[in-house]
Amino acid sequence: MSDHKTLIKNGMWANNPALVQLLGLCPLLAVSSTVTNALGLGIATLLVLVGSNVSVSLVRNHVPKEVRIPVFVMIIASLVTCVQLLMNAYAYGLYLSLGIFIPLIVTNCIIIGRAEAFASKNEVLPAAQDGFWMGLGMTSVLVVLGAMREIIGNGTLFDGADLLLGDWASVLRIQIFQFDNSFLLALLPPGAFIGVGFLIALKNIIDNQAKSRQPKQEKPVIERARVTNA
């Protein structure tokens, strides 16, 4: 398997930051109450991941090992500030909805973890690919979890899409069920914990079924030769 395919497999499935590494749970649980919020935070995290991986890879040979972590954090904080300003300018409603969780991207273990474990040891192109696929893996889990919680909690899908994509996106809103009252358990953090648990369980079931289909290799039987004195 090529290095690029390995990065895709690791980011999207085998080493998914949300379902396998269980990193970034704070924003994952708090913000994924709707697809719009989940997608907005996921895109912001993806952009910061790619930017930080590229930046760290570029300076990896010029930063002393003793101060590399503070330098990495400064790079990540600068990129998060840029993303925050862009969101404030072009998606102000979503910016208000996400609130403190945008600047908290700085402390997201996924970003500093990939910077330290991968970007600081690899060239720019592989580092950018790693950041993209890890970010896309995180975003996909956010969106799936957000869709589950929004459908169960409010009976809608893509509610508030205009906050992210503009006024035209209000037509994307789908009313799946009609509830007199919202199902708060799905919209609050306990519902997010339950949803993440279901997604992790589903992934484990799929992995176990895939392993069971693979042909089992029988271990060769090694016979010991007994040597006796003549």
Swiss-Prot record:
Its EC number is 7.-.-.-. Its main location: membrane. It is a multi-pass membrane protein. Part of a membrane-bound complex that couples electron transfer with translocation of ions across the membrane. The complex is composed of six subunits: RnfA, RnfB, RnfC, RnfD, RnfE and RnfG. HAMAP family: RsxE_RnfE. PANTHER family: ELECTRON TRANSPORT COMPLEX PROTEIN RNFE (PTHR30586), ION-TRANSLOCATING OXIDOREDUCTASE COMPLEX SUBUNIT E (PTHR30586:SF0). Belongs to the NqrDE/RnfAE family. NCBIfam families: PRK12405.1, rnfE. This is Ion-translocating oxidoreductase complex subunit E.
